[in-house]
UniProtKB/Swiss-Prot annotation:
Role noted for this protein: Low-potential electron donor to a number of redox enzymes.
One Pfam family named in its UniProt record: Flavodoxin_1
GO MF terms held by the record: electron transfer activity; FMN binding
Keywords: Electron transport, Flavoprotein, FMN, Transport
Residue ranges annotated for the Flavodoxin-like domain, each copy included: 4-145
Name under which the protein is recorded: Flavodoxin
Listed NCBIfam families: flav_short
Organism of derivation: Treponema pallidum (strain Nichols)
PROSITE patterns according to UniProt: FLAVODOXIN, FLAVODOXIN_LIKE
């Protein structure tokens, strides 16, 4: 059974909704999932997890949130080599179907750090995740559990 830390930052609650759906899917898929806001995760427990799902909504000009999430992610980035990592987040700045540059950049950043990025891409949702987007997040979590 994989032990997965799901760590997120959410300014509006939309990425938190995604995180909760992913945790539900992970548990259905047979993983042991722990959910943390980025400020509540103890970096000292990093090595006790097999896999990580990181969530951050797009901020500014299609980038990771800079005051809480970016410093956290920078602090653990050097430890991602060989780790199975899933990425997710919501966006609002671009129109539906037009966003995602921050996720593409984040995926490439994780790959450059040596992470095994799940499915080679992140799970994104526009604005407040619809029922369809929430179902997609649950399925994403279930697949990541395997």
């Amino acid at each position: 059974m994989a032990k997965v830390a799901v760590i997120f930052w959410s300014g509006t609650g939309h990425t938190e909704t995604m995180a909760r759906c992913i945790v539900e899917g992970l548990n259905v898929g047979g993983a042991k999932a722990d959910l943390f806001s980025v400020m509540d995760f103890d970096v000292g427990t990093f090595d006790s997890y097999d896999r990580f799902a990181f969530g951050c909504s797009a901020a500014g000009s299609e980038e990771l949130e800079s005051s809480e999430f970016e410093p956290f992610f920078t602090s653990i980035e050097g430890r991602l080599s060989g780790k199975k990592v899933a990425l997710f987040g919501s966006y609002e700045w671009a129109g539906e179907g037009e966003g995602g540059e921050w996720m593409v950049n984040w995926v490439e950043r994780c790959k450059a750090a040596g992470a095994d990025v799940f499915e080679g891409k992140g799970e994104i949702a526009y604005d407040d995740p619809s029922e369809e987007a929430q179902a997609s997040c649950k399925a994403f979590g279930e697949r990541f559990a395997r």
